[in-house]
Amino acid sequence: SSPVRKVCRGLIEDGLSTILVTRDIVTRIQAQMLGVPAEDFAADQVPSGAGHYTGRADVYVPDALLSLFKREGISAESLYTVDREGRQQPASLTENQFAILRSDREEKRTLLGRFRGGRVYPLCHNGCRPFGVRPRSLGQQFMQEALLLSAEEAPLVILMGPAGTAKTFYSLAAGLEQVMEPESRAYRKILVCRPNAQFDQDIGFLPGSEQEKISPLLRPIVDNLEILLDLEHKKERSGEEELRSRINYLFDTGILTAEAMNFMRGRSITDTWLIIDEAQNLTPRQVKGIVTRVGRGTKVILLGDPAQIDHPLLDERSNGRSYARERMRG
């Protein structure tokens, strides 16, 4: 990249308007130190901060309409938001966006719903307990709803949040519920992929089979499985050996499988619960490659924390998970 910076500097000295466009953050900093304007690819950038899509909205509704909510939902025309100056604005909702409905008389009186077809309807899976797990926060209630919707209704779910918000834990719980339970079975298996910054580049240099190569990356998945299986058998005091045996059973029977990201290309994945953990370390191109591999009856769950990006060429606005969030809204 040094010759590139020198060329840019030479063009500037010749009086030509020059901007260096690169994804490499270090190169941009070095260029600016030399007096060369540098920026990232604008086309791949998504809004940051308050401008990005969160998947939920806080809206107000006339108190008299709340009694009709469970029976027929509430029209979006009756909803409004309040700006910082206290002025009312018509609510602008996106299809499938979750809504927190607040009474205009008593703000603490709230109801939860999902916007579809011009109206906000109650959540369908509010009372469910996938694999015995109960939502403990507002975000987890919305998470549960999105995960338990059918693949036809919600083929792609994007979960974002800091560490400790149960993204991986809840995704596994909902997946196991819909793969292992006969009454609610909707998928053949769970497929887990978990990239990291160097995963696609250096997996071939690790010894062993594909499973042995990716096993270090799946330790967080196994940690969550241990908690879930312990919850399922909470009346029994499971020893370490028995717990390990149950986890091995899931892998040995094909209920749960794990694959490397660079082996996804060219596949058509059907009737599968597909979890992509740490998706903030994927590029937009990689996310597009995953989504286009999905066949009939498959549900894709992208998980990620935008504050924990390890890829040297990605940031909060250019990573694949953020890109998918903005492009696939609705």
Q: Which residues fall in each region the model found?
A:
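Walker B catalytic carboxylates
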Residues: 277
